[in-house]
Amino acid sequence: MPLKIEALREICSLENIEVTTHAAKRLEQGGISVGDIISCVKTGKIIEQYPTDYPFPSCLILGMNVKNVPIHAVIGTNLETLWIVTAYFPNLSKWESDLKTRKENDS
């Protein structure tokens, strides 16, 4: 069953967010805060689904950070907790101008 942004928004709070080790490194490298991730979920749309991710299904969300800058966040969930898998500012060398569509040559 695909994840729904409305369900993610309902559980999106500091008490329900876990940050993976990989995500912690990426957030620090990119200057991204957990507040930016919350903003992304609250303002964003799911643009890719990863239903077979382990240990929980995940999805890629395109939303805005707290400074209203587009951001991508991969969020896994068991519908009780949100796990931040990674987050980054989308790069136009890998994404079309809509920031929702991967470029063909991206692997």
What are these regions (language model features)?
Residues M1-S107:
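Ribonuclease/tRNase effector modules and their secretory precursors
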